[in-house]
């Protein structure tokens, strides 16, 4: 998923840790409430401080998460590539977000 990142506003920053223990900072671009339809929420992330490519686009990563019983956000999970309904919903919400930008 790519996003033309020509707007200028602050994003919340989170740290992701990969399987090797490497930490990477990401900016939260958008959160999506998918609890009613899929029983979980979604977050779209961009690498913190990343620059646009020659086409003016920046790489976006999407994850799902469920809230813990205490109301805190749980662990991020990759979205299955074969989950067309989830990806369609994410794309629809993201496109609406871009239209509002």
Swiss-Prot record:
| UniProt cross-references to HAMAP family, sorted A to Z | UPF0473
Q: Which family does it belong to?
A: Belongs to the UPF0473 family.
The protein in question is named UPF0473 protein SUB1774
Which PANTHER family does UniProt cross-reference here?
A: UPF0473 PROTEIN CBO2561/CLC_2432, UPF0473 PROTEIN CBO2561_CLC_2432
Pfam families named in the record: DUF1292
């Amino acid at each position: 998923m790519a996003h033309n990142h020509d707007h200028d506003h602050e994003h919340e920053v989170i740290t992701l840790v990969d399987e090797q223990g490497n930490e990477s900072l990401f900016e939260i671009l958008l959160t999506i409430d998918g609890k009613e339809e899929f029983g979980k929420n979604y977050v779209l992330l961009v690498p913190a401080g990343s620059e646009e490519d020659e086409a003016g686009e920046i790489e976006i990563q999407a994850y799902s998460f469920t809230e813990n019983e205490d109301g805190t956000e749980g662990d991020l999970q990759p979205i299955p590539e074969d989950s067309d309904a989830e990806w369609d919903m994410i794309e629809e919400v993201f496109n609406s977000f871009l239209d509002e930008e």
